[in-house]
């Protein structure tokens, strides 16, 4: 990924962390040593064996999609192995996540990495994966919006609650 901050172009790498790929801590350390600005990792909670959703890249689903690590756990390892490298989700599948747990994971990773976390989000492409999480794919954008609003409240307020169509929780500390 490339992005511009002010007048400076920054360069990052995208990685599918799996149990048979390069160790994420070693990769992060190597990227930082070579002057990269960031490391982004994907998210899939699971890939249903029987799918209605075709792979967006066409053809067969690559093996790496079948065995991805949790992005927050993987990025925690990368954070521990580096000092300056920014760490990001590319993307975090918000419709499939509990907003309270996700808000806690995001805040914890950002704090423990000294503010190096980049939270990139999306709705996803795999209809079957969404449905397994109880999400109607046609409403995923509405679900994303509401969950993000709930998480923003948890990050901004000492005692935050939320009441909506998809998210409901009483004022809580998080």
Task: Please provide the spans of the model-predicted regions.
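N-terminal beta1-alpha1-beta2 module of alpha/beta enzyme domains
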Residues: 3-81
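Internal, glycine-rich beta/alpha segment that forms the wall or movable "lid"
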Residues: 49, 60-61, 85, 89, ...
């Amino acid at each position: 990924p490339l992005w511009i901050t002010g007048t400076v172009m920054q360069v990052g790498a995208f990685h599918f962390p799996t149990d048979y790929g390069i160790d994420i801590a070693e990769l992060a350390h190597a990227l930082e040593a070579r002057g990269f600005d960031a490391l982004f990792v994907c998210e899939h909670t699971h890939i249903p064996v029987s799918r209605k959703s075709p792979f967006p890249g066409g053809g067969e689903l690559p093996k790496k999609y079948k065995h991805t690590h949790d992005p927050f756990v993987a990025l925690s390892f990368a954070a521990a192995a580096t000092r300056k490298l920014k760490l990001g989700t590319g993307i975090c599948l918000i419709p499939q996540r509990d907003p309270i747990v996700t808000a806690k994971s995001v805040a914890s990773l950002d704090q423990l990495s000294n503010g190096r976390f980049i939270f990139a989000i999306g709705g996803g492409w795999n209809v079957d994966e969404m449905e397994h999480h109880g999400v109607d794919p046609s409403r995923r954008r509405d679900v994303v919006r509401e969950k993000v609003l709930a998480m923003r409240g948890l990050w901004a307020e000492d005692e935050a609650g939320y009441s909506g169509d998809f998210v409901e929780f009483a004022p809580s500390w998080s």
